[in-house]
């Protein structure tokens, strides 16, 4: 499953793993859309392997136990895991998100 998540996370400059109906997922994808980022979005609750991918994302976010909070949204930029809602929003407020998106080729401005 780790290889599958890594492959999916590298398919575009920005990849977001979400669940439909998750308001924090919507907040992150809306922010990226407003920044004109064309992210690949994978809704885990609509994927037959979604539960296994969610466990892998939790492990990546919170360590080997996979415990510590929600696994979605999980945002990858340039193939690297950035984090969830709080990390992405904090980066945006500090002015760090746009430069990272530019360096990954997700923004051209």
From Swiss-Prot:
Cellular component (GO) terms are:
cytoplasm; nucleus
Q: Which InterPro entries match?
A: GlrX-like_pln_2, Glutaredoxin, Glutaredoxin_subgr, Thioredoxin-like_sf
UniProt keyword terms in alphabetical order: Cytoplasm, Disulfide bond, Electron transport, Nucleus, Redox-active center, Transport
Supply the Pfam families for this chain: Glutaredoxin (PF00462)
Glutaredoxin domain location: 2-108
Please give the chief subcellular localization of this protein.
cytoplasm
Task: Write out the residue ranges of the motif Responsive for interaction with TGA factors.
Answer: 106-109
Recorded hits in PROSITE patterns, A to Z, give:
GLUTAREDOXIN_2
Cytoplasm as UniProt keyword: yes
Disulphides: 22-25
- Write out the annotated subcellular location: Cytoplasm; Nucleus
* Family affiliation: Belongs to the glutaredoxin family. CC-type subfamily.
NCBIfam families in alphabetical order: GlrX-like_plant
The task this protein performs is described as:
Has a glutathione-disulfide oxidoreductase activity in the presence of NADPH and glutathione reductase. Reduces low molecular weight disulfides and proteins.
- This protein is called Putative glutaredoxin-C11
Q: Which gene encodes it?
A: GRXC11
């Amino acid at each position: 499953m780790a290889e599958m998540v890594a492959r999916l996370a590298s398919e575009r400059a920005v990849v977001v793993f979400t669940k439909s109906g998750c308001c924090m997922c919507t907040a992150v994808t809306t922010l990226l859309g407003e920044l004109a980022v064309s992210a690949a979005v994978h809704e885990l609750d609509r994927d037959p392997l979604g539960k296994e991918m969610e466990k892998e994302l939790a492990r990546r976010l919170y360590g080997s136990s996979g415990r510590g909070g929600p696994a979605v949204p999980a945002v990858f930029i340039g193939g690297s895991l950035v984090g969830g809602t709080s990390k992405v929003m904090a980066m945006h407020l500090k002015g760090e998100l746009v430069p990272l998106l530019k360096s990954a080729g997700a923004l051209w401005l």
